[in-house]
């Protein structure tokens, strides 16, 4: 959680200084090994990273999926990424969300997903886990063609994760964090 001070006179809030700080994090010592950076600013100073679910909800409710996700691919910064094409050719992602609330997050699995006979569980507001055994990535994409914007804007689903066991992932926040962010 940082301060956003580059353009305090603008009425529209968007990440600016936040991105500078995220790049600083990715370029500093052991921090450069980070695979995911979730970063935001809180003008009220009420938000805390010690309250992980609240922090995620804050970011997910403000996230502009078209502008706030920044990928670094084939970067030499990441020597611990074994999914790359070679040594020191990994990837990272910065999710930098700031500004006014853009959506209310889903607090139940949306009916449109249940109607598709998905084995899905609500992990936390805005995050749904889907059983990988019942839907391949391609099948999931085909089933949801044309529904992505509605799931996001009307239903408040920001993140869907395919997993072997959606109920396990949803049973504890640490299960979600471990499976989603340390195994990719």
Model-derived segments and their meaning:
Residues 1-184:
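Charged, compositionally biased interaction regions
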